[in-house]
């Protein structure tokens, strides 16, 4: 088939790579897609040459600047390891290769081969240049008795002196450790040792080391702004993050100095992806734009730093904010922010209209929309079925007194249409949104902050005959002024539609949403997706070879997560960062998420388990997915269960290809090391919990991988990409509370009577913090042009296993079918919770999306 190959025969290879300067952020904003030559012309000017090894044309890669050596998967040297072939160099630039991606360049290379070498299974590569490059892929053609071999690389390669061991890449085959070709075993083991490192020293830019550390870099002790160290203690338990090894602060030897955050080099794509424009935008926002906003408000000497009316709020996207010329000129050149901040050429800054206000300007004020967003909004997984009355607390009464709810049956039954509380409990029609226990322990401290005046809230909701929810009562609690241990001071507010009572009701709903906004950002979003996933990403890279089937299954679901989390530590969740500036808990924000993590349960992250735990579903073998939903028209749950089922089916089919028995799971040394470390180190503060899967059965493996995939994809999409569509109207989702409900006889009460809108606006997030909040959530809610969605892969040939590829294709087809079902449900007028008074169809779990602010799309990973 391949003819006769004698000694001296050569194997042709094609190497695809991208030079560093193509991936430079500022350069990308002004170049086309023509690869190195085009880039050199566009950036440097024709004929310009840089010294010191900086790349300016494709010829820089030729000569003896990049070498490669094949490693045999079938023939060994004298030590029993795969034979290493002769060192060869890139030979020819292939500028017109049709399969090239944007800004990629291809080169030919020829390897000497004879029959005694066998089939290649890996290769070494050396970079002799000063600058690194991004190695995309390598393809070997016409291997005798084998055909084509592909290597999917996607990795930065630095100068060879940066590495203690040669950079190695493995063929795109899949092997359990026990099935690895013997000649490759040593190389497989060594590569994992390199990725684990030795746990010492400060990490450098070129490092590829994955290790664990606590969150000891959020504060700035030397600047007088310390924060508790999260992780490593029973007081402040937390998932681990990537170790950086930075210098410690003078004031606190256990805290790291703030500054640039290391992430393993291949986690930081530089600016290879357009998604990096979005992450860079967050950084620009933190460092450049927020100070400019502050300056603008000061310079303009706005009547106050307040909105004066609801129309004033809507002007943010209907008319825009006029900014001083010098302010706008400083924002405009920042490439990452050009799309985020649109201007009309007249020094006006304009936000895009949020979806929640596109059809109806006042729909957000209705009780139906308030209740609908509890099950179809951006935080749809906190509501619980009420199973006892009155609601009780789990807080220690010796510390916080009696936190039992003061809501009475009589108050609820006013709006229950003749149904009693007992009847509603027995027929599963009462629900609660309960933030009492999350906020009460922090409320005394929060309310001592300069502008915070907040409550802990409980909201009771009733399931109506038409399938919608309506709020029956809101309880607003604050700590007793003489001590937390005396219990709360509480008021109960009931629905009202007229007069001052309707304003008080609107303010009570605002206080609920302020609780909900803070909890959503800190727990539902940051903790339950970003933070809990990072340890699994670290453990996967440390213990599962790229040849391992579970690595190939999970790797796409970690894409950019460590990178965005590092950026969050630097600009979002750090001391005096964006989150502390714009959300109620302020400096106690991340500490609050630590207290919630104490009760985090890995197995409850599976959607069916979560729904059952919250009382929103009952196990029923005859029902779809084995669950009967208590609220039948629960958009997040209905769509989510279909996505969960598709994920679990795909994971089951894939895992079954490699693990036919429980024994296969137990005997997989890499898999066992991975799981042990993810639990005992990555989530070390919870390692003794009995609920951790033991990783002894195929079901343990399938369930655990399904939870990881679900959390990284659909769960994150559900709590992230609706942030601007719902929260872009600060009236709908305020983030700060600055006033308690005014008492009768006070000037604030009189203002509330005379000017309800002004009273509302003086209670919620003011103008400066609104600008910060909207700027951030707009970036977070966007999809990049090159987003990779669930059921897709960056590389179609991600494995050579045809059965795995077929199963993956079925997974994609199933997800496409679910999209059609979602669209059909959104068109069904009987399902009122799908669109609500604001006429916003629930599409957050619609798998595919276009670029931008779309209110839909499930990316594979937590990449923003």
UniProtKB/Swiss-Prot annotation:
It catalyses: (9Z,12Z)-octadecadienoate + O2 = (9S)-hydroperoxy-(10E,12Z)-octadecadienoate. SUPFAM superfamilies: Lipase/lipooxygenase domain (PLAT/LH2 domain) (SSF49723), Lipoxigenase (SSF48484). One of its GO terms (cellular component) is cytoplasm. One of its GO terms (molecular function) is iron ion binding. Keywords: Cytoplasm, Dioxygenase, Fatty acid biosynthesis, Fatty acid metabolism, Iron, Lipid biosynthesis, Lipid metabolism, Metal-binding, Oxidoreductase, Oxylipin biosynthesis. One of its GO terms (biological process) is oxylipin biosynthetic process. Induction: By jasmonate. It holds the Pfam family Lipoxygenase. Binds 1 Fe cation per subunit. Iron is tightly bound. Residues 174-864 form the Lipoxygenase domain. Residues 44-171 form the PLAT domain. Residues 244-264 are annotated as: Disordered. The keyword Cytoplasm applies. Its main location: cytoplasm. Its cofactor is Fe cation. It comes from the Eukaryota. Belongs to the lipoxygenase family. Monomer. This is Seed linoleate 9S-lipoxygenase. The gene is LOX1.4.
């Amino acid at each position: 088939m391949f003819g006769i190959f004698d000694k001296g025969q050569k194997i042709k290879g094609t190497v695809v790579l991208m030079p560093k300067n193509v991936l430079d952020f500022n350069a990308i904003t002004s170049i086309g897609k023509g690869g190195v030559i085009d880039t050199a012309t566009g950036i440097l000017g024709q004929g310009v040459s840089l010294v010191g090894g900086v790349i300016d044309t494709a010829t820089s890669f030729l000569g003896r600047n990049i070498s490669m050596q094949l490693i045999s998967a079938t023939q060994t040297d004298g030590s029993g390891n795969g034979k290493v072939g002769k060192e060869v160099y890139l030979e020819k630039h292939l500028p017109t290769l049709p399969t090239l991606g944007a800004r990629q360049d291809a080169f030919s290379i020829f390897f000497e081969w004879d029959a005694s070498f066998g089939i290649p299974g890996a290769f070494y590569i050396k970079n002799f240049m000063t600058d690194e490059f991004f190695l995309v892929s390598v393809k070997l053609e016409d291997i005798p008795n084998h055909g084509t071999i592909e290597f999917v690389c996607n990795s930065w390669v630095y100068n060879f002196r940066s590495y203690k061991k040669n950079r190695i890449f493995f063929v795109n085959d899949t092997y359990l450790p026990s099935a690895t070709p013997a000649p490759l075993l040593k190389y497989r083991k060594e590569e994992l040792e390199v990725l684990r490192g030795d746990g010492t020293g400060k990490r450098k830019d070129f490092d590829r080391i994955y290790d664990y550390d606590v969150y000891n870099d959020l504060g700035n002790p030397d600047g007088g702004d310390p924060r508790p160290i999260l992780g490593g203690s029973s007081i402040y338990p937390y998932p681990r993050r990537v170790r950086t090894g930075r210098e410690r602060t003078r004031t606190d030897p256990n805290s790291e100095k703030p500054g640039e955050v290391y992430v393993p080099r291949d986690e930081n794509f530089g600016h290879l992806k357009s998604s990096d424009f979005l992450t860079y935008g967050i950084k620009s926002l933190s460092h450049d734009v927020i100070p400019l906003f502050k300056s603008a408000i000061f310079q303009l000497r706005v009547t106050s730093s307040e909105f004066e009316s609801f129309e004033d709020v809507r002007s943010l996207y209907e008319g825009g904010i006029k900014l001083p010329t010098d302010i706008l000129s400083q924002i405009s050149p920042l490439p990452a922010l050009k799309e985020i901040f649109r201007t009309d050429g007249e020094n006006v800054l304009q936000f895009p209209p949020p979806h929640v206000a596109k059809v109806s300007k006042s729909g957000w004020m209705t009780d139906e929309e308030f209740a609908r967003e509890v099950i179809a909004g951006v935080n749809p997984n906190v509501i619980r079925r009420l199973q006892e009355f009155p609601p009780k607390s789990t807080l220690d009464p010796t510390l916080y007194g009696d936190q039992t709810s003061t809501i009475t049956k009589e108050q609820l039954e006013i709006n229950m249409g003749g149904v009693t509380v007992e009847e509603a409990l027995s027929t599963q029609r009462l629900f609660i949104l309960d933030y009492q226990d999350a906020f009460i322990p922090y409320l005394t401290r929060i309310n001592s902050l300069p502008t915070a005046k907040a409550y802990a809230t409980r909201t009771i909701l009733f399931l109506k005959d038409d399938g919608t929810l309506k709020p029956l009562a809101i309880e607003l609690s604050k700590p007793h002024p003489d001590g937390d241990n005396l219990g709360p001071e509480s008021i109960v507010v009931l629905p009202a539609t007229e007069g001052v009572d309707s304003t008080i009701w609107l303010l009570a709903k605002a206080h609920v949403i302020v609780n909900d906004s803070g909890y959503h950002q800190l727990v539902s979003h940051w903790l339950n997706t970003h933070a809990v996933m990072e340890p699994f990403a670290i453990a996967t890279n440390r213990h599962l070879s790229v040849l391992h089937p579970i690595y190939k299954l999970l790797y796409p679901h970690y894409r950019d997560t460590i990178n965005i989390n590092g950026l969050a530590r630097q600009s979002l969740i750090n001391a005096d960062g964006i989150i502390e500036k714009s959300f109620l808990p302020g400096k106690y924000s991340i500490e609050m998420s630590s207290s919630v993590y104490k009760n985090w349960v890995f197995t409850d992250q599976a959607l069916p388990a979560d729904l059952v735990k919250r009382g929103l579903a009952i196990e029923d073998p005859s029902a779809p997915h084995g669950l009967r939903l208590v609220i039948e028209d629960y958009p997040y749950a209905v769509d989510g269960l279909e996505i969960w089922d598709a994920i679990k089916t795909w994971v089951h089919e894939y895992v079954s290809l490699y693990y036919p028995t429980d024994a296969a799971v137990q005997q997989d040394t890499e898999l066992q090391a991975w799981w042990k470390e993810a639990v005992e180190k990555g989530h070390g503060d919870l390692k003794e919990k009995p609920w951790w899967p033991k990783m002894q059965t195929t079901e343990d493996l399938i369930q655990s991988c399904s939870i990881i995939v679900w959390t990284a994809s659909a769960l994150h999409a559900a709590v992230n990409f609706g942030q601007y569509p719902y929260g872009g109207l600060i009236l709908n989702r305020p983030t700060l509370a600055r006033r308690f409900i005014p008492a009768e006889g006070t000037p604030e009460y009189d203002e509330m009577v005379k000017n309800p809108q002004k009273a509302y606006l003086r209670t919620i997030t003011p103008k400066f913090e609104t600008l910060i909040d909207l700027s951030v959530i707009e970036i977070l809610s966007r999809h990049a042009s090159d987003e990779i969605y669930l059921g897709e892969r960056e590389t179609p040939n991600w494995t050579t296993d045809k059965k795995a590829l077929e199963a993956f294709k079925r997974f994609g087809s199933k997800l496409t079918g679910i999209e059609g079902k979602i669209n059909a449900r959104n068109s069904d007028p009987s399902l009122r919770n799908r669109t609500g008074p604001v006429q916003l169809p629930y599409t957050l779990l619609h798998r595919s999306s276009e670029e931008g602010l779309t209110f839909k799309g499930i990316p594979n990973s937590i990449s923003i």
